[in-house]
């Protein structure tokens, strides 16, 4: 880990590969902030957050399976498999009732974790993610999700680097960081395409059609004035989100930094 003087790197073996993660426990009686980066991002995505919190709270962040240090890793695993591995790692580290902060795909994983272990989580913060439900997606989004791999394979790598970094962050720091994380898949463009278009994860998303009752309260954060379309999107999110009596903060349309 490039920063994180207090963080300790550990690993966990699964049938599909070895997961690497970083953890700092200062008091087992305190809550633990569990940071889950999104697709193609890794633990570096949250380096500023872990640097700030690591001396104040228990902190955990991982490189998700098939990402960064958690490679090589076979791709025949599902989102529910990832949630089970996450739970097993947290048990191993004696982390109970965490607050999970999930960015993009990390938010999907957090929702899967809540579905499987509803009494093993203290709170959920979603950063630029969406409900884990097919009903939330448009027909075009579903069509693209099912055909993503060939589309990414024909996308010129340099153009993809430029579009990916600019589309994920607004600051120079955030864009440079995202570019650096994407470059860890260079020069194997096909590996990046397979990761982005993982069919097992897509199946997990597309088969989930149920709605969930919102029982907590939500906070919306945005860096610019919210238009009615964003407010409507947020309200849909709140109506369908899995919440078990704790509060939820939704950073809607937030840049990934």
Residue spans for each PLM region:
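Conserved alpha/beta-hydrolase catalytic His-Asp/Glu region
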Residues: 135-136, 155-212
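Alpha/beta-hydrolase fold catalytic core
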Residues: 1-34, 55-57, 95-96, 251-256
């Amino acid at each position: 880990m490039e920063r994180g003087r207090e963080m300790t790197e550990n690993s966990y073996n699964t049938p599909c590969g070895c997961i690497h993660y970083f953890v700092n426990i200062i008091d087992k009686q305190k809550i633990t902030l569990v940071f889950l980066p999104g697709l193609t991002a890794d633990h570096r995505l949250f380096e500023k957050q872990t640097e700030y919190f690591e001396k104040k709270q228990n902190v955990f962040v991982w490189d998700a399976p098939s990402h960064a240090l958690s490679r090589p890793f076979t791709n025949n695993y599902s989102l529910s498999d990832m949630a089970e591995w996450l739970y097993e790692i947290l048990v191993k580290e004696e982390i109970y009732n965490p607050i999970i902060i999930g960015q993009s795909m990390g938010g999907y994983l957090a929702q899967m974790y809540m579905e499987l272990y509803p009494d093993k989580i203290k709170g959920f913060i979603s950063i630029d993610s969406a409900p884990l439900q097919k009903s939330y997606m448009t027909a075009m989004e579903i069509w693209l999700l099912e055909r993503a791999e060939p589309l990414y394979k024909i996308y010129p790598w340099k153009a993809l680097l430029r579009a990916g970094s600019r589309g994920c962050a607004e600051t120079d720091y955030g864009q440079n960081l995202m570019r650096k994380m994407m470059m860890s898949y260079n020069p194997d463009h096909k590996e990046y395409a397979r990761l982005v278009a993982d069919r097992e994860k897509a199946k997990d998303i597309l088969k989930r059609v149920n709605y969930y009752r919102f029982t907590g309260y939500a906070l919306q954060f945005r860096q610019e004035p919210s238009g009615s379309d964003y407010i409507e999107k947020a309200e849909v999110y709140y109506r369908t989100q899995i919440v078990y009596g704790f509060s939820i903060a939704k950073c809607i349309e937030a840049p990934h930094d």
